[in-house]
Amino acid sequence: MKLGLARAAELMQASGQYEAEAVAVGYSIDSRTIQPGELFFAVRGERLDGHDFVEQAFGKGAVAAVVSRESKTRFVDRAKLLTVDDPLRALQKLAAAVRLIWGKPLIGITGSAGKTTTKEIVAHILANRHNVLKSQGNLNNHFGLPLQLLKLEPEHEFAVIEMGMSHAGEIRALADLARPDCGVVTLVAPVHLEFFESIADIARAKYELIESLPAGGIAVLNADDPYVSQFGRDFHGKVVTFGLQKPADVSARGIEARGPSGSAFDVVSNGQGVRATLPLLGEHSIYNALAGVTVGLQYGISLQEAAESLASLSAGDKRGQVIEFAGATIINDCYNSNPKALDSMVRALASMPAQRRIVVAGEMLELGTGAKDLHYENGRRMGPAGVSFVLGVRGLARSIVEGAAEEQVHGKFVESPEQAGAWLVENVRPGDLVLLKASRGVRLERALDLWMGKSADKSH
């Protein structure tokens, strides 16, 4: 939202010198990507201090910079400096003010997995009738979420915002900024256990979104998740549910697996069913789709419209992308991983025709003290899913290979994505089906890049 600097300074309680008529056309915390006319916030991160890049931001056309009062003396030319106690807090304060000024429905989405895909589906369905702002990528933390809120414009009728967390209290802080009218919780899984003592503690952290909803708000909950299904008990607003197994307000029936093309099913609500086609892989994607339909129904989208919208979805970057290469079918799902998501994708392979089903499984991070056992159990589930070979990549992925071996599934462990890529170059054959999945920190896409690059070289 464009704001005059005088108005922005007022909302942030900032002081300083600036041109009276100057206007911020956007907002940035990154001097590398800042655009002319944007307001630069010199926030301090874990490794970098934005105050070191103020001059660079001005060189790229920043209209002004928000700096801390204690750092003001670093700058000889103090024109176009807005001073505050803490630039990050000022960014958040301005974002919260813009959200209140905008004043229209905002849907907040959280969960241990599926947040980004569900956000995309919700926005896609609402866009049938409305102008929707959605958070970009997975910008879902105390830096990214305020920047998304500052993109709100009067013409936007809805906002769909993803909320992530690693520690208790973080969802509440994000919700205090975003003021969601509707909260969606996808599921609770053993993710970030490095920072929590139990899954129940993770659930309590996710519940902060529901606690933050207004009395007339809407809670959209997974009826099949043992934790999320309980979130509506003490909520005084409207509770609507989605699921496949337990009774739910929105469910799927007659699920037909269609291999790499995804699935088809009847979306059922209030006794009415509409056949839908979903070009995303795995049972977890059906849950995400049902969550999206459930939100759409709350805001005037018909069941027919919502169900038909699913057919035009596409997989996001490194999120279940299906690639045909050198006679093999590749499923690039290496954006992130956790035990539940890996299991869902592995089970999806069972419905796909293939000469061999190969799983390239990277280490899953932030699982806490039980991480080794969780990796091992994922490996044990490879056999029943018809997996032919498991390639474990880095660290605790060795336990995935060991678990798979117990179920007579052959495997190999390598230390790096580069070694995995070299193995793929030499061993994948036409007709193979290959799944790549790992936590973001493993950078498993390097294996895919190496494989496709080297294989292309070999073919010339």
Describe these PLM feature segments.
Residues 8-11, 71-77, 184-329, 354-355, ...:
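Acidic, Mg2+-coordinating active-site environments of NTP-dependent enzymes
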Residues 9, 89-218, 223, 229-235, ...:
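Phosphate-binding loop of NTP-binding sites
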Residues 413, 431-452:
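Peripheral docking tails and interdomain loops at the edges
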